[in-house]
Structures are given as structure tokens and as C-alpha cells.
């Protein structure tokens, strides 16, 4: 399993027992007693309260406290270097344009995002989208890039990321780094 949420869980709790299930089945399986707890992702981060579930750990807060305020890296867009510099820059440019459009046209962007909202109401959709489509989506900023590198380094130390990957050599296209 190679997701940033899973890696955050392992960094926070070490070697814990896990079962892999589709993300939209996590809350129902906790509610029906199949599992004692679950790693809640996507809109479940907002909707778990509707089910009277207790938070054991908020990984974002945990990472923020651990790093002195850095944001927890969740997801991200990557481009293979073998595609060449121009392709990397073009993909970055068009992705950035898409995000900027969403920020300038929130009503249209939110309507588009509803397709993937899995039944959430408009207000929850707005809150969820604003968590992941914001100024930091366009530019991680210096502390965001440092956070990504630290997260990868800790994942390597824990054995979740191959040791020959050089996070210091990682490029953030368009960041003027």
C-alpha cells in the first residue's frame, strides 16, 4: 500500500495491523463492527461526525505538531523525468491553469467536483474542495517542499520508501527553486 495517508499512519503508530479496503467502505465497516477503527480519507474526513465516530489521531495535526507547523503532504502530482523538461513544464503549466481556473470560478468548479462527491451536500463539497484546491495547490511554498522532503525521508527511515530515492534531488517544477 503506497499512499501518503497510509505512510502517515505508519509513521505515527509504527507497525500496526491493517486491512486494505476501498476508502468508501471504511466508515461502514467500522460502524458494522468489522473493524475497531479505520484510516478515514477523502470526504470521510468531514462526514465521520455524522456517524458519531471518535478520532484517535488527526494525522494532519500530528504532522503539523511534529514539524513545527508544516503542512502534511497528501497526494501530489508527479511527472516522470524521462519525459523531458519541456513535458514536465507543460504538464505543470496546464495543471496550474486548471487549479487557477477553479479558484477564480468556484461555483463552476464545485459543480464539477460534485460528480466525485459520493452523495455529500453542497456545503460539505465546498469545504472538502477548499481543503485541496487552494493557493498551496498551486505552490507548495518553501515549507511545503521541505515538508514533502522530510515526509519522504521519514518514510525511507521506516522502510516504506526505497532507500535509493534522493528526496533532496526532487524537483518542484514551477517553484523557482
Go through each PLM region and give its residues.
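Conserved C-terminal helix/tail region of periplasmic/extracytoplasmic solute-binding proteins
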Residues: 154-177
Amino acid at each position: 500500500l503506497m499512499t501518503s495517508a497510509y505512510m502517515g499512519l505508519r509513521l505515527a503508530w509504527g507497525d500496526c495491523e491493517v486491512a486494505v479496503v476501498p476508502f468508501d467502505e471504511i466508515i461502514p465497516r467500522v460502524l458494522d463492527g468489522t473493524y475497531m477503527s479505520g484510516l478515514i480519507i477523502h470526504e470521510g474526513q468531514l462526514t465521520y461526525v455524522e456517524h458519531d465516530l471518535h478520532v484517535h489521531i488527526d494525522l494532519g495535526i500530528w504532522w503539523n505538531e511534529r514539524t513545527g507547523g508544516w503542512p502534511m503532504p497528501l497526494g501530489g502530482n508527479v511527472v516522470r523525468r524521462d519525459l523531458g523538461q519541456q513535458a514536465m513544464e507543460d504538464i505543470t503549466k496546464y495543471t496550474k491553469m486548471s487549479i487557477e481556473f477553479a479558484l477564480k470560478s468556484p461555483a463552476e468548479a464545485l459543480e464539477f467536483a460534485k460528480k466525485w462527491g459520493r452523495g455529500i451536500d453542497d456545503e460539505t463539497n465546498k469545504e472538502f474542495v477548499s481543503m485541496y484546491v487552494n493557493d498551496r495547490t498551486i505552490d507548495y511554498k518553501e515549507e511545503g517542499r521541505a515538508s514533502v522532503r522530510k515526509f519522504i525521508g521519514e518514510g525511507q527511515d521506516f522502510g516504506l520508501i526505497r532507500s535509493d530515492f534522493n528526496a533532496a534531488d526532487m524537483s518542484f517544477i514551477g517553484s523557482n527553486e
